[in-house]
């Protein structure tokens, strides 16, 4: 179920609860269709929420593109942190979400704008364990199987 589908489902009272990334919880609350009970950071500190992922194929066939993607991600994240109002306007414009809702969501959100994958490694490994225990994946993954930090390390060493 996508975020949009989940918002529709809770708005139509087809489900009793949803777990979604921001700004969806704020949208639901502002529309009077639910309330935020717990922030995801309260459930697991330093959890991985929205992450940059590239395929092994792209890494093998076009590492120079991956390098540029990582550099762009770092610059964009830093820009967002320094220009939150402008970032909110860009997001609202691209998604057609109400600007005030986006700004409120950014204030309520308990996450952090980060680029260093080391900060979410433990959370990602733990998430993998849960996915395995639920039978969604055939085995629990290690940090080394999930992360290739070489592109991040190279990008940050060139600053």
Walk through the language-model features, giving the residues of each.
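Residue-level detector of family-conserved "landmark" positions at structurally sensitive sites
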Residues: 38-39, 102, 141-142
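Pocket-lining segment of extracytoplasmic ligand-binding domains
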Residues: 4-93
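Secondary-structure end/capping motifs
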Residues: 60-138
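Short secondary-structure boundary/hinge segments and terminal tails
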Residues: 28, 45-47, 109-110, 148-151
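Conserved C-terminal helix/tail region of periplasmic/extracytoplasmic solute-binding proteins
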Residues: 129-159
